[in-house]
Amino acid sequence: VSAKNRITPTGTPTLSKNAITYGDALNTIALSGKLHDNVNNVDVDGTFEWVDGTHIPVVGNGTYAAEWIFEPTDTEKYLTVSGRSNITVEKAQQYGKVSMAGYTYGQAPSTPTLTDRTGDANAQVTYSYAAAGNGSVQTWDIQNPPALNAGTYRMYASIGDTDNYYGFEAVYCEFVVAKATPTYTKPTDLTAKYGQTLADVTL
């Protein structure tokens, strides 16, 4: 077979899996199989590979057309072939651990934080709180935190859904608003005459 008469094999590769999670590169999917020579009705041996196996597709509309190339073993008889295979790109999970330090009633409230975070660093985070046990959940405004009475509370954190990540609800943590100790000034130089009661003494 002369170079100008080389045959173009047809077909598509077999994928080791049809879906990946956002953050995974294309080369986490292995390509295998053979193409077919429709002229002679025989299978064509060769090697498949991704054009860019390090590429990390975004979720987009959920389907990504990934480009592959097939290099035939017999390059004198067959042409190199390229094509695309559709794969599903699924959203990835996010994670975070909420924490909140306790404080004393009457002092400035602590600020909740989210640590050990994975996912989209730009995803919106919403904090909320409730009295431990039976309180209704309410939004915690970091810029204008509520004035809470002494007691035990739960802090919640919610990471918002993004184009490539699912939202995440962090496990709540508990924090304590401690009772305050009243301040006072001990009176001095008090005097009383014999026969007076304490009620008669001016403070």
Question: What are these model-derived regions, one by one?
Answer:
Residues 1-203:
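Solvent-exposed beta-strand/loop surfaces, strongest in extracytoplasmic domains of secreted
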